[in-house]
Amino acid sequence: MEKEYNTFTVRRLFVEDLPLIEKYSQYYDNLFFNPVSRELLPNIFLNGAFWAVFDGQIPVAVTYILAADSSCFSETGAGWHLADLLGETASHCLLCGYLWTDDKYSGTDFYTPVVKLWLMQADRRNKNILVHFVPAQMKTDFESLFYNGFQLMALRGLDNLVPHWLFARNTEIETDRIPAYEDVKTCPLSDTKELSRLCEKGYRAFDMDVDKNLLFRR
């Protein structure tokens, strides 16, 4: 299955594409816990799917989806209680895994076509919340995520050891109709202790200011 978005093609990957998946998932090898290690990959093939972004015939990014209520969710190392973090049960959520991208395409917004894919898959699977998690040690395109309707919900660890940014968005959000909020707080991205505290108080980061500080609201 292929979908065209501007100059990029998004295509589902299958078992025969395993070398491509392993090429990108090796970026996790430097972390203590790898949620897409070779022994865990079959779980995603069975309960979710891998997708790649192609520039012509060249693969430039890879992501995956996984139903949050699947039995293998815990095997990703995520001990999160989504109901506590998001106010939604796992059965309503579609996990959208880290988006690996080639370094030479740095600065290219792959999130816009990929989020369209995630939304389509959420609709097919009757999920109304997209949950996207990104290793805090890896470069994160906060602005593209915010532009595509995601909010930063928390900084949480995989296997209680590897910190990940946890983003979420409702599938019915209209990103060009964001209401005004009076209770807005600013926090530097580097101040992880303070931003975690704000998230625990119910604040959600939704944008960045000109100095690249996170803007929180609740």
Predicted regions and their residues:
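Conserved active-site alpha-helix within GNAT-family acetyltransferase domains
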Residues: 124-126, 136-155
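Conserved catalytic-core motifs of GNAT/GCN5-like acyltransferases
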Residues: 133, 149-166, 204-211
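Conserved GNAT acetyl-CoA-binding A-motif
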Residues: 93-94, 122-136
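Conserved beta-hairpin
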Residues: 48-67, 76-78, 206, 217
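Conserved acyl-donor/pantetheine-binding loop and adjacent beta-alpha core of acyl/acetyltransferases
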Residues: 61-98
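Conserved beta-strand-loop-alpha-helix junction that forms the acyl-donor binding cleft
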Residues: 131-142, 187-189
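Conserved acetyl-CoA-binding loop-helix of GNAT-fold acetyltransferases
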Residues: 98-101, 106-122
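Short amphipathic alpha-helix that is part of the acyltransferase structural core
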Residues: 1-39, 45-54, 59-60, 179-186
